[in-house]
């Protein structure tokens, strides 16, 4: 996977300092050099995936529009569209490299990324001309935390899902906080990750859906333990 490198393909300036540590030391503090380094890392990842005999590769999309996720203050007309146009421009050469390698690029649908739900995935897919290597990594824990119907999501996108993370989570909103979490630590958030079986994800339903649609990939266990 290239989650950190994919993140650096598209970084909004507001996050420059936070993400700079993901890059090689020689390109830190230089956003353009950092992006070029990240893109080159993805090109090499395409070749490495091919050599390893992989058919799917996991990554993040990065984010140019995420700081404007909530529509207040009112977003300037065309801002989101411009951001996704640029995102597609940056990713299309990478997708082409993975096409040459015979490997799918599976974007983990994740908060903090411009691709954080089905709609935003479609926005990039359309701008890449429905690129045959633009695909999805399904992780239900990230959908629980935003109250998205993760079972219907499989019905809609089963043809796009090529990697599956088995990760549990819970969402327990109160009269004091909800989806946004009130800037609290992970332990004190309404939505948080849990050990497999300790959360609210209906894995029986998910595996039934995956079997129904003959999912061809692995079910990869991911643990993000919150000690409570």
Spell out what each predicted region is.
Residues 1-13, 61-65, 166-178:
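Short, solvent-exposed beta-strand-terminating loops
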Residues 9-135:
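Active-site acidic/histidine proton-transfer and metal-coordination neighborhood
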Residues 226-228:
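Conserved small/polar residues in nucleotide/adenosyl-binding loops
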Residues 41-56, 149-162, 204-212:
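Short amphipathic alpha-helices and their capping/turn segments at secondary-structure boundaries
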Residues 58, 162-165, 220:
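Conserved beta-strand positions in the central sheet of alpha/beta enzyme cores
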Residues 218-224:
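Short acidic/histidine-rich active-site segments
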Residues 181-184, 205-218:
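Short glycine/proline-rich, acidic loop/turn segments that cap or connect secondary-structure elements
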Residues 80-200:
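Acidic/histidine-rich catalytic cores of soluble enzymes
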């Amino acid at each position: 996977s290239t989650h950190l490198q994919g993140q650096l393909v598209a970084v909004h300036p507001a996050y420059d300092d936070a993400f700079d540590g993901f890059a090689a030391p020689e390109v830190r503090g230089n956003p353009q050099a950092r992006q070029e380094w990240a893109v080159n890392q993805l090109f090499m990842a395409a070749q490495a995936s091919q050599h390893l005999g992989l058919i799917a590769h996991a990554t993040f999309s990065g984010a140019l529009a995420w700081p404007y996720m909530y529509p207040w203050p009112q977003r300037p007309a065309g801002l989101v569209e411009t951001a996704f146009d640029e995102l597609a421009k940056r990713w299309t050469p990478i997708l082409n490299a993975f096409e040459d390698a015979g490997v799918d690029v599976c974007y983990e649908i994740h908060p903090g990324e411009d691709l954080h739900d089905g709609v935003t995935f479609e926005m990039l897919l359309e701008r890449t001309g429905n690129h045959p290597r633009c695909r999805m990594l399904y992780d239900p824990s990230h959908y629980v935390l935003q109250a998205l119907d993760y079972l219907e999501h499989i019905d809609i996108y089963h043809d796009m899902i090529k990697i599956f993370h088995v990760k549990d989570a819970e969402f327990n909103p109160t009269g004091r906080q909800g989806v946004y979490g009130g800037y609290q630590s992970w332990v004190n958030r309404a939505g948080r990750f849990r050990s497999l079986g300790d959360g609210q994800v209906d894995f029986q339903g998910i595996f039934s859906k995956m079997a129904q649609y003959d999912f061809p990939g692995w079910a990869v266990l991911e643990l993000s333990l919150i000690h409570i």
